[in-house]
């Protein structure tokens, strides 16, 4: 019997787990993917929003400002990358200035510090590449950027070392309400828990509807992005927004925490909750709308990849974080779209309070609050590099040339708490395969290391999910029950 089961190991589920483990209780996280950060958390803008867009008085507004406030201290405690680069919301016409002013006033009501309304000239002094058509801008100095993978993994690792269990490849397929608990049916057996926290992203409505007569509907809203090489990383220093619409914050241009340039996302409501495909139409929209914000975008040849992500949109445009009225002990954390990444640490605390009111627990005296992340050789000083190599020669063996990732870093990613078992798991922890060649050079070597360290045949190594094998031929036929003659 568990005290709490959390369904979903994205940034929200991991944040909830980390906060719950401050107390003496038995917690398990069930995740249908093979790693943390496999859903919405793996494909978003990586923005730490200031909090001026959310409706004053809403849960989204409260958690946005609080999440932004604590992100910097959390990044130091859990050793993930974060930077306050500031953000600008652009206005292109005189008749739009009133909307910009309303956005400013919302931010003031929400308690966002340092907001300023700028003229077009003042905005261009901050960002010289802005379009000459910009007539005004809202500047938010508290806006920031973060690695969504790094944040999620840090929260999950810290929850794990404090006692939380993580069970991957474990999809929830049903639930029964017992007298004082829930029986959660999964593809890997049944689990019983007094409290269930539903942090399942775009599938949160499906889980809610298993236990409640009052049905929930979430829409999968797809966003497509283009990612530029680090050559273009200095094109802007701040996150550049256009005025938000009913579908979201619009097409942005932003540096990433690792030095790339990111543009996107689109906003398209789709039926397929696994619809992570990009389209020519969508990417054309990204380029066309992003081009409005600047004089000229960097050349297309500097784009190294494109991708799409899904966020869970709820019709009332606010987060749903509450105990379900007709399913006591079942807590929804649903409709977590932008600014969900920013809010995640605050959501973790908010849900922990709900759980503590429901089932009080004793605070741990030995809670581990500090984590040491993977040391990056690319960003280390010469002295630090020499020290790492002297302790382990694997740090002298460069595996990924684009990002200068060494074997030592990959080994750390595999053997640390909640170690990587997939190629994407290595990529998200070390950036091996994230560079210009997109793993063209390092893929075989990374597969060999994973195979060696996990003592698995190289043919069984997957990119991310079940069945995403790279290798075929004889080994694939053998794995699927065929024979050598069938090649």
Question: PLM features: residue spans?
Answer:
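Iron-sulfur (Fe-S) cluster-binding segments and ferredoxin-like electron-carrier domains
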Residues: 274, 406-417, 440-458
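Helical element adjacent to the flavin cofactor pocket in flavoenzyme catalytic cores
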Residues: 138-195
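Short beta-strand to alpha-helix junction loop
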Residues: 55, 62-65, 90-99, 138-157, ...
């Amino acid at each position: 019997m568990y005290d709490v089961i959390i369904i979903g190991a994205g940034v929200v589920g991991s944040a909830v787990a980390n906060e719950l483990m401050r107390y003496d209780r038995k917690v398990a996280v069930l995740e249908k993917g093979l790693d943390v950060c496999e859903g919405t958390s793996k494909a978003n803008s990586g923005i730490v929003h200031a909090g001026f867009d959310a409706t004053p008085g809403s849960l989204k507004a409260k958690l946005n400002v609080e999440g932004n406030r604590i992100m910097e201290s959390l990044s130091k405690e859990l050793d993930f990358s974060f930077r306050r680069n500031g953000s600008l919301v652009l206005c292109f016409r005189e008749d739009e200035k009133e909307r910009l002013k309303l956005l400013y006033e919302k931010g003031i009501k929400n308690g966002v510090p340092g907001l300023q309304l700028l003229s077009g000239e003042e905005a261009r002094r901050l960002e010289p590449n802005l379009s000459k058509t910009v007539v005004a801008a809202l500047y938010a100095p508290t806006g920031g950027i973060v690695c969504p993978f790094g944040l999620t993994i840090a929260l999950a690792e810290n929850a794990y070392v404090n006692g939380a269990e993580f069970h991957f490849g474990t999809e929830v397929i049903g639930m029964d309400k017992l007298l004082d608990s829930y029986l959660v049916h999964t593809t890997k057996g049944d689990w019983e828990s007094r409290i269930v926290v539903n942090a399942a992203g775009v599938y949160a409505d499906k889980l809610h509807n298993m236990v409640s007569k009052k049905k929930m509907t979430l829409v999968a809203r797809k966003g497509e992005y283009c990612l530029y090489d680090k050559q273009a990383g200095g094109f802007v220093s701040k996150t550049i927004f256009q005025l938000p619409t009913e579908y979201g914050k619009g097409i942005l241009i932003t540096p990433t925490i690792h030095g790339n340039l990111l543009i996107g996302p689109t906003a398209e409501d789709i039926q397929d909750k696994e619809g992570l495909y990009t389209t020519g139409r969508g990417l054309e929209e990204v380029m066309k709308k992003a081009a409005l914000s600047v004089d000229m975008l960097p050349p297309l040849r500097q784009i190294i990849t494109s991708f799409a992500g899904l966020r869970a949109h709820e019709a009332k445009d606010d987060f749903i974080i509450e105990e379900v009225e007709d399913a006591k002990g079942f807590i929804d954390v649903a409709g977590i779209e932008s600014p969900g990444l920013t809010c995640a640490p605050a959501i973790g605390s908010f849900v922990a309070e709900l759980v503590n009111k429901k089932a009080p627990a004793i605070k741990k005296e030995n809670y581990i609050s500090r984590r040491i992340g993977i040391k990056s050789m690319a960003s280390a000083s010469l002295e630090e590099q020499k020290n790492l190599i002297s302790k382990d020669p694997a740090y002298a063996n460069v595996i990924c040339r684009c990002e200068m990732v060494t074997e030592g870093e990959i080994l750390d990613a595999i053997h640390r708490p909640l170690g990587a078992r997939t190629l994407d798991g290595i990529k998200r922890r070390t950036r091996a395969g994230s560079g210009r060649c997109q793993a063209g050079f390092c893929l075989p070597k990374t597969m060999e290391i994973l195979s060696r360290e996990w003592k698995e045949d190289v043919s069984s190594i997957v990119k991310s999910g079940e069945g995403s094998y790279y290798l075929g031929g004889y080994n694939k036929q053998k794995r699927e029950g065929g024979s050598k003659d069938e090649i």
